[in-house]
Amino acid sequence: MAGYARRPGVTPLSRARSLVIPDDDKLGDLEAANPFSFKEFLKTKNLSLSKEDTDSRVYSQEATRHSLGLDRTSPASQTVGYGLEYQQPFFEDPTGAGDLLDEDEDEEDGWNGAYLPSAMEQTHSSRVAASTSPCSTYVSFFSNPSELVGPESLPPWTLSDSDSRISPTGSPSADFTAHGESLGDRHLRTLQISYEALKDENSKLRRKLTEIQSFSETQTEMVRTLERKLEAKMIKEESDYHDLESVVQQVEQNLELMTKRAVKAENHVLKLRQEVSLLQAQVSDFKRENEALRSGQGASLTVVKQNTDVALQNLRVVMNNAHASIKQLVSGAETLNLVAEILKSIDRISEIKDQGEES
């Protein structure tokens, strides 16, 4: 039933929606890998509904053959010779799911994509025109999709010669009608159950979508906050890097200066060591000279002492000689004084004699 042509101009009621979350490509893979996901649920239910619909279609075709008096081995194209040309089978949705889903499509703008399960497409594809008879609904249900073109051009029924006993104006038998109604009710109940299940699943998915959207917004805000923090941290790290680079350059310059100073200091130390060695040699020479001088000074002192002793002795001798000469001079002076006195007394005596003679 999922392969029927879709009626143009009719909005499909099974338009599924998928949440598109940016930068999260793994969500679809995780949902596809989850056996309890909504897709797996729809796939299982669609398989069961397709199998059940196939069985009911086979059973309905057999019942139609039996009620119309056709052979069991006749082909499917001759089973129903009505010549109806519908575009696809149409069933009215008794629950009004089309309006509800159309309102939901207007409310939800954030959904996109399309996922068309066969059960929903089978149920809510199109509606039959108002002029179509109730019997044609069941006829379209039991007919092949290729034989259904549309309700506008309905030629009169054309039956084969073997089936000429069936009149196009005649009504179906009671068994056929009851069987068709039971199949329609059964199919309607199945569709209602599937619709309720899909509705519950849709509400759950909406709640889950709301939670995912809030979680996505929270994660987006967190990512933005982390991006801002990361940018600030990167700016700070870049400034720290530039500061550290300048500090490293200064340290390298200081190391070069210290290296040059260390080389100069080593050269200066070598010169000082050479000078110290020279000074030590000079000190040793001075020590030897001092010792030599000390030894020579002792010898000269003895000589000087001897010379001074000799000089003292000579001085004493000279003093003694001087005293003796001085004594001699004094005695000679006294003698001279005595001679002078004698001479004076002689002169006086002669003068007295002269005066006495003159007188």
UniProtKB/Swiss-Prot annotation:
Free-text description of this protein's post-translational modifications in UniProt: Phosphorylated.
Cellular component terms per the entry's GO annotation: centrosome; ciliary basal body; early endosome; midbody; recycling endosome
Region (Disordered): 153-180
Homology family: Belongs to the ENTR1 family.
Organism, as annotated: Bos taurus
The keyword Cell division belongs to this UniProt entry's keyword annotation: yes
Protein name per its UniProtKB record: Endosome-associated-trafficking regulator 1
Species classification: Eukaryota, Metazoa, Chordata, Craniata, Vertebrata
Function statement: Endosome-associated protein that plays a role in membrane receptor sorting, cytokinesis and ciliogenesis. Involved in the endosome-to-plasma membrane trafficking and recycling of SNX27-retromer-dependent cargo proteins, such as GLUT1. Involved in the regulation of cytokinesis; the function may involve PTPN13 and GIT1. Plays a role in the formation of cilia. Involved in cargo protein localization, such as PKD2, at primary cilia. Involved in the presentation of the tumor necrosis factor (TNF) receptor TNFRSF1A on the cell surface, and hence in the modulation of the TNF-induced apoptosis.
UniProt key word Electron transport: no
Keywords from the named record: Cell cycle, Cell division, Cell projection, Cilium biogenesis/degradation, Coiled coil, Cytoplasm, Cytoskeleton, Endosome, Phosphoprotein, Protein transport, Transport
Description of its domains: Tne N-terminal domain is necessary and sufficient for basal body localization and ciliogenesis.
Region (Required for interaction with PTPN13): 100-125
Coiled-coil region list: 185-295
Modification Phosphoserine occurs at: S18, S74, S167, S171
Quaternary structure (record): Found in a complex with ENTR1, PTPN13 and GIT1. Interacts with PTPN13 (via the FERM domain). Interacts (via N-terminus) with GIT1 (via N- and C-terminus); this interaction is direct. Interacts with NOD2. Interacts (via N-terminus) with IFT88. Interacts with VPS35.
Gene Ontology annotations of biological process type: cell division; cell projection organization; positive regulation of cilium assembly; positive regulation of protein localization to cilium; protein transport; regulation of cytokinesis
Entry's localization field: Cytoplasm; Early endosome; Endosome; Recycling endosome
